[in-house]
């Protein structure tokens, strides 16, 4: 019984470590990884999974390490694409929030989101709607 409980918790943490690693990758792609971006990532992971709020620093630390060791985004997206479209849309929304956190939309950031959308089966139309939603929210 306890083994199963710990196994599920480990799976949950791994899921959020992968998501956080993708978000860290997006934050670093413009060569500037700010405290504001870290705060957005932490808040996003806490909002996605309320039970991990006490472990958020550990999750972010593991995600940063995973992102440094990885050489492709496929590793981060392969699990995320299995979840509902609403969940995947939320991930894209968080990515746009990270992109706009410094007030600019770098070409590398846009390209990354376009590639992630393809890997997560999010259409260009839905991506555009999500992008506009984030822009309106930040005004």
Segments from the language model and where they lie:
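Small-residue-enriched hydrophobic alpha-helices in membranes
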Residues: 1-139
């Amino acid at each position: 019984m306890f083994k199963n409980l710990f196994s599920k918790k480990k799976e949950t943490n791994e899921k959020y470590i992968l998501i956080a690693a993708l978000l860290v990758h997006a934050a670093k792609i413009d060569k500037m990884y700010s405290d504001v971006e870290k705060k957005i990532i932490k808040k996003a992971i806490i909002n996605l999974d309320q039970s991990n709020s006490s472990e958020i620093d550990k999750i972010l630390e593991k995600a940063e390490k995973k992102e440094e060791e990885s050489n492709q985004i496929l590793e981060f997206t392969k699990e995320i694409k299995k979840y509902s479209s609403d969940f995947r849309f939320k991930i894209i929304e968080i990515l746009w929030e990270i992109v706009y956190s410094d007030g600019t939309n770098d070409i590398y950031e846009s390209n990354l989101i376009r590639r992630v959308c393809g890997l997560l089966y999010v259409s260009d139309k839905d991506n555009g709607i999500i992008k506009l939603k984030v822009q309106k929210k930040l005004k």
